[in-house]
Amino acid sequence: MLTLKIFVYTVVTFFVSLFIFGFLSNDPGRNPGTKDF
């Protein structure tokens, strides 16, 4: 059960990191070609 918890927390942290990285990458200041929502 402990291993399952660690696995779930690792996956959640991984997806949160991807979301934050994608949000920063979509910054209009870095990508002038994209529209600013």
UniProtKB/Swiss-Prot annotation:
The keyword Thylakoid applies. One of the components of the core complex of photosystem II (PSII), required for its stability and/or assembly. PSII is a light-driven water:plastoquinone oxidoreductase that uses light energy to abstract electrons from H(2)O, generating O(2) and a proton gradient subsequently used for ATP formation. It consists of a core antenna complex that captures photons, and an electron transfer chain that converts photonic excitation into a charge separation. The keyword Transcription does not apply. PSII is composed of 1 copy each of membrane proteins PsbA, PsbB, PsbC, PsbD, PsbE, PsbF, PsbH, PsbI, PsbJ, PsbK, PsbL, PsbM, PsbT, PsbX, PsbY, PsbZ, Psb30/Ycf12, at least 3 peripheral proteins of the oxygen-evolving complex and a large number of cofactors. It forms dimeric complexes. The gene is psbI. It is a single-pass membrane protein. One of its GO terms (cellular component) is chloroplast thylakoid membrane. The chain crosses the membrane at residues 4-24. InterPro entries: PSII_PsbI, PSII_PsbI_sf. Keywords: Chloroplast, Membrane, Photosynthesis, Photosystem II, Plastid, Reaction center, Thylakoid, Transmembrane, Transmembrane helix. The lineage of its organism: Eukaryota, Viridiplantae, Chlorophyta, Nephroselmidophyceae, Nephroselmidales. Belongs to the PsbI family. It holds the Pfam family PsbI. One of its GO terms (biological process) is photosynthesis. This is Photosystem II reaction center protein I. It is found in: Plastid, Chloroplast thylakoid membrane.
